[in-house]
Amino acid sequence: MKYLSELMEDKQTLLFNKTKTFFAFSPEQLEKGKKKHNIKNTKLVSMGGGMICPKENAETLSEGLEKIYKDSILEDIKLHTINRIVLRELANYECFYTGDISDCVENLRDYPGISKKLIVKIFNKNYNKYNTY
């Protein structure tokens, strides 16, 4: 079962290539990214988290990332049931071990049809099955 990040990965890579986006955390990485995308005499902007792109591509990048995120959520729901998605995230954040579902709730906040109430219900229904501690 794929995670949301895995569903987004290939689409993001295509967008990064189209918008000449790269990640740099040092002057050397900055130069390497500029060289890879043949960027010369172009104003670059930081998009956060080390992500850098030419200024003229910033809006396209931002809008593209938002679209990929929303489309990938819908793809996730299409590929997996809501119940399986919630169980995947409860397990991923070790909620059955810690008893704290807040990270799961936060991660699924943008999923249509998934609420904190539903997550609590699925957590309680499956607690004994998945809590092996």
Model-found features: residue ranges?
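Soluble, non-transmembrane alpha-helical interaction regions
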Residues: 1-133
